[in-house]
UniProtKB/Swiss-Prot annotation:
HAMAP family: PPAT_bact. Its cofactor is Mg(2+). It comes from Nostoc punctiforme (strain ATCC 29133 / PCC 73102). Pfam families: CTP_transf_like (PF01467). Homohexamer. InterPro entries: Cyt_trans-like, PPAT, Rossmann-like_a/b/a_fold. It catalyses: (R)-4'-phosphopantetheine + ATP + H(+) = 3'-dephospho-CoA + diphosphate. The gene is coaD. The record marks H16 as: Transition state stabilizer. Pathway: Cofactor biosynthesis; coenzyme A biosynthesis; CoA from (R)-pantothenate: step 4/5. GO terms for cellular component: cytoplasm. This is Phosphopantetheine adenylyltransferase.
Length: 183
């Protein structure tokens, strides 16, 4: 059985990758499908995202990476997929995803939506959270693969926050601070 895991993946996170890995154990093939959405201004181009995802999933032989535009169900039919794979982080995700699943069912009765609960450690994680943290100079090293973290830091002209080798907690780089003393 072929499953499509659609999304913008801008950027792909460890939460997405956890879902892909788990899906790859459930389905014969998982196609990670990057949506080309002309109405959004992404951090990374579709081509960059495809390459980032390929590097992140190269150890999974039954995972393929592709891009598409238009309706997800049309793409799924074109790829002969029977399942749309979706992750659920919270109840709010469920409401939106359930509506989408019902809508997709009205468009194609041949395609089922399968929901996987996000692993606890990624239940808060989204691409927008990663972008927001990085934009303000925070460490995202624990949220995305290393090669993607570097790409993101470059987009925001930040260096990777230095890690304390003892505690592995992010330590902000020291800044030159001049202190004036009263005489």
């Amino acid at each position: 059985m072929i499953a499509i895991y659609p999304g913008s993946f801008d950027p792909i996170t460890l939460g997405h990758l956890d879902l892909i890995q788990r899906g790859s154990r459930l389905f014969e093939r998982v196609i990670v499908a990057v949506l080309r959405n002309p109405n959004k201004t992404p951090l990374f181009s579709v081509q960059q995202r495809l390459e980032q995802i390929r590097l992140s999933t190269q150890h999974l032989p039954n995972v393929e990476v592709d891009s598409f535009d238009g309706l997800t169900v049309n793409y799924a039919q074109m790829r002969h997929a029977q399942v749309l794979l979706r992750g659920l982080r919270a109840v709010s995700d469920f409401e939106v995803e359930l509506q989408m699943a019902h809508t997709n069912k009205t468009l194609s009765t041949q395609i089922e939506t399968v929901f996987l609960a996000t692993s606890n450690e990624y239940s808060f994680l989204s691409s927008s959270v990663v972008r927001e943290i990085a934009r303000f100079g925070g460490s995202i090293d624990h949220l995305v693969p290393p090669h993607i973290a570097l790409d993101i830091y470059q987009c925001y002209n930040h260096n990777s926050p230095m890690l304390n080798p003892i505690s592995t907690e992010a330590i902000p780089p020291l800044k030159n601070i001049s202190v004036e003393r009263e005489a």
